[in-house]
Amino acid sequence: RRQRQMCIRDRWGWGSVIADEFDLNKISVENCAMAGRSARTFLDEGRWDKVYHALQPGDFVLIQFGHNDAGEINTGKARAELPGSGEESKVFLMEKTGKYQVIYTFGWYLRKFIMDVQEKGAIPIVLSHTPRNKWKDGKIERNTASFGKWTREAAEATGAYFIDLNKISADKLEKKGIKKAADYYNNDHTHTSLKGAHMNAKSIADGLKMADCPLKQNLK
C-alpha cells in the first residue's frame, strides 16, 4: 500500500517517497514511521507491536533510528536510551509518570526489533540514520562513532542486512557542496525537504544493491 504524506511544515522523510524506487507491480510499501520517536518510544507506545503482528514470512522491514535517541532519559521528552550497543540496563524514575522503567542501550532495542522480524520469517534491513546538514572543514558530519556504529554492531550481531545510509547520502552531499546541500533540507540541519527525501530514498536503493539484498530485485 503506497503512502505519500507530507510532514508538518513541508518536512519530508524518505518513508513517504521510498515507494518511488520500487516496481509496485511486484511489491507493496507500508510506511509505519512516526516523527519524533526514538527506538525506545516507538516500542513503548505500542507502535512496534503493530508492525510485529502484521508481519508475514518473506516481508522486508527497513529499520532506522538515531535522530531522536539522544537527550533526556527520564525528564523532558524522555525518549533517549543508554548509549552503546551492549546488554547494559538501568532503572529510572520517570518524571512524567512517577513510575520506574528499565531502560536499555540503543543497540538492545535495535536487536529486539531485528530478532522479532527474523522470528516472523521476515527479512530485517537496518539503516544508519540520515546525515545532518552540519559541516566542518568542507566535510559533512558523519555518525560513525555513535549511532551509526551501534546500528552496524546490532546488524552484525544478528546477521541482518546493514546499509550505511549516513555515508551514502553524506558522500552525495559533499560532492554537491555546502551551498547546494541546503536545498535538500528544510529550515534546519536535520529535517529534509522533498528533494532530500528523494535523495535518501535513492541512497537506500543504492545500498540495497551494495548489500546484495534480495529486496533489490523489486527495484525499478
Locate the predicted segments by residue.
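Short, small-residue-biased leader/transition segments that mark boundaries at the very start
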Residues: 1-8
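Short, conserved active-site loop motifs that form the nucleotide-linked donor/cofactor pocket
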Residues: 4, 27, 160
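Short catalytic helix/loop segments, enriched in acidic residues and glycine
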Residues: 9-24
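Active-site phosphate/pyrophosphate- and oxyanion-stabilizing loops and adjacent acidic/basic residues
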Residues: 16, 20, 49, 152
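A short beta-strand-loop structural module common to alpha/beta enzyme folds
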Residues: 25-38
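N-terminal post-signal-peptidase region of extra-cytosolic proteins
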Residues: 38-50
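Alpha-helical cap/lid subdomain in secreted, periplasmic
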Residues: 50-192, 198, 202-220
